[in-house]
Amino acid sequence: MGTKDTTQKRLEDYEDIFADISNVLLYDGKDVIKENELETVTAKDTYTVEQQIHEVERDVAKRWRHHSLHISLIGLENQTDPDYKMPLRVICYDGASYRAQLNADESKKTYPVITLVLYMGTEKHWTAPKQLTDCFKYDERLGKFISNYKINVVELAWLSDEQIMKFKTEFRNFVELLRDTRLGRKPQYSPIQLKHVHELLQLMRVMSGNDEYEQLLNQTTNNLKQNKLKGDDITMKKIVSLGFDEARAEARAAGRTEGMAEGKAEGRAQEKFATAKRMLALGKSLQDIMLITDLPMSKIQELQTEVKPA
């Protein structure tokens, strides 16, 4: 399915996704940057130190042109964990881009470089430095002479619901997954029509650690071939609904073979508990059980203490 780094880049590299991210984070969701105004630039820059050539590689970078004028170079850097030296890394990325402008034809106008650090952690806030002077100790008397470089860290899982709703592409669904993972609840997906289904599901798989997203990807591929999904129907809600129908039926059938009669007598709630216990015994992930049974994470964790793995 690919590594986190690879799958993150793969989705973000699409012009519509990149423009959407940039518009929400730079222009409060206004449709300022058009996808047809973006051009991909090489993610690698080189520089020479002591006669040795070194490379600096960004995650994703695009040049924004409007009416043939360069407005800015925008770079995205993905982080799943806080990086203490991130300000130093961003300086290297930005510095390499400015060096390229310095070495270019003098007739070409220079333009600003903007780097957005997309923090995808869900367990804790970004705890690493956000500016250069927090990376080291220094004589305070020298403070006014030190150029303090600040970085733009965006904690995706902590964006407000209002901010998340400003995303117009399926990147909104990904941010919703991060938010709901942080809150320990069943993902609540907006009905956004998907253009990059495979890339989104691959990213959700590696970021959540839930193998069921790989099954969803395979089922979705088949559903697309069979025209069960098309046009406006291609949304995360529809994909999850179709994809988990079979898993839900199998889980309930398995539960019934091991005592669902008593669960029926006690009502629908007990049926869900029995299904969850069966899935726990089979080693299914808590996230998957929550998706199938609609039980809160706290209840599933409580049931987990009562179940021995098969």
Label the model's feature ranges.
Residues 1-226, 310:
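Conserved single-residue anchors adjacent to enzymatic active/cofactor-binding motifs
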Residues 67-80, 179-310:
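Short, charged alpha-helical interaction segments and adjacent helix-coil junctions
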